[in-house]
Amino acid sequence: MTHLERSRHQQFPFHLVAPSPWPIVVSFSLLSLALSLALAMHGYIGNMNLVWLALFVLTSSATLWFRDIIAEATYLGDHTIAVRKGINLGFLLFVVSEVLIFAGLFWAYFHSAMSPTIELGGVWPPVGIEAVQPTELPLLNTIILLASGATVTYSHHALIQGNRKDALSGLFITTWLIIIFVICQYIEYTNATFTISDGVYGSVFYAGTGLHFLHMVMLATMLAINYWRLRNYHLTSSHHVGYETTVIYLHVLDIIWLFLYIVFYWWGV
């Protein structure tokens, strides 16, 4: 039933979602991923096969779920103004939760850095740790992220003004900038002289920057999907909730990275 047909019988503007298997499948695949990862890390299972299987099921089911959401928004007209307001509110709460997670990681970092224990040698970084220099890859990544914030803003404003060509160009450049950031971060990790198991410094460093790295991988995927949708005329100047939330997400990650760079790379060294 299309939105126009439903409006004759429905006295409220909200979308009644049809029965879907994806929420329960995603939930169980997330549970399976967490359990298999914990079992593999503690040596209860000898390989990562269950982890990769759970990750494959999670990725596949999430992709199919978002496919249905795109169909409801683009082709069925189910995302009314009231629904879009609800989506924006939900995304805002998601951003708040992300900020609180990183606030906890910064707290852990400052707790260890401002009063290093005797076991750490009484200094920060601890004795034996060769910290990543802030003027090398981290500085390049900072410049890349600031540039991506500018290009995605240019693309967003071009879309609002109906300039599809510039919107596509800006989004294409932004997507590749984020991909380059992810590659540079991976190179930094592979060349670092310490690991996540090297005491509290390694743990909190990789917990903070690694969580941001995973979010950047997810952001690159979101940008690529929005580029595909924009090329296929899914997004208009007045209806582009998915793209708008992605832009906000990028700016939030930009700000978090600036704090990570200042605290973890510059002040912490």
Curated annotation (Swiss-Prot):
Q: Where is the protein found, in the record's own terms?
A: Mitochondrion inner membrane
What organism is recorded for this protein? Answer: Lachancea kluyveri (strain ATCC 58438 / CBS 3082 / BCRC 21498 / NBRC 1685 / JCM 7257 / NCYC 543 / NRRL Y-12651)
Source domain of life: Eukaryota
Task: Relate the protein's function as given in its record.
Answer: Component of the cytochrome c oxidase, the last enzyme in the mitochondrial electron transport chain which drives oxidative phosphorylation. The respiratory chain contains 3 multisubunit complexes succinate dehydrogenase (complex II, CII), ubiquinol-cytochrome c oxidoreductase (cytochrome b-c1 complex, complex III, CIII) and cytochrome c oxidase (complex IV, CIV), that cooperate to transfer electrons derived from NADH and succinate to molecular oxygen, creating an electrochemical gradient over the inner membrane that drives transmembrane transport and the ATP synthase.
- Principal EC category: translocase
Can you name a GO cellular component term?
mitochondrial inner membrane
Pfam families listed in its UniProt record: COX3
A molecular function annotated in GO for this UniProt entry is: cytochrome-c oxidase activity
Q: Which UniProt keywords apply?
A: Membrane, Mitochondrion, Mitochondrion inner membrane, Translocase, Transmembrane, Transmembrane helix
- Cross-referenced InterPro entries: Cyt_c/ubiquinol_Oxase_su3, Cyt_c_oxase_su3_dom, Cyt_c_oxidase-like_su3, Cyt_c_oxidase_su3-like_sf, Cyt_c_oxidase_su3_a-hlx
The answer to keyword Kinase applying to this record is: no
Q: Can you say what this protein is called?
A: Cytochrome c oxidase subunit 3
Q: How does it assemble?
A: Component of the cytochrome c oxidase (complex IV, CIV), a multisubunit enzyme composed of a catalytic core of 3 subunits and several supernumerary subunits. The complex exists as a monomer or a dimer and forms supercomplexes (SCs) in the inner mitochondrial membrane with ubiquinol-cytochrome c oxidoreductase (cytochrome b-c1 complex, complex III, CIII).
| Any single biological process term in GO | mitochondrial electron transport, cytochrome c to oxygen
The keyword Translocase is assigned to this record: yes
The record's catalysed reaction(s) read: 4 Fe(II)-[cytochrome c] + O2 + 8 H(+)(in) = 4 Fe(III)-[cytochrome c] + 2 H2O + 4 H(+)(out)
UniProt xrefs under Gene3D superfamilies: 1.10.287.70, Cytochrome c oxidase, subunit III, four-helix bundle
Q: Which SUPFAM superfamilies match?
A: Cytochrome c oxidase subunit III-like
Q: Tell me what topology the record assigns in the membrane.
A: Multi-pass membrane protein
Where does the UniProt entry say this protein principally localizes? mitochondrion
Q: Which family does it belong to?
A: Belongs to the cytochrome c oxidase subunit 3 family.
Gene designation per UniProt = COX3
Sequence intervals crossing the membrane: 21-41, 45-65, 90-110, 138-160, 167-187, 205-225, 247-267
Q: What is its EC number?
A: 7.1.1.9
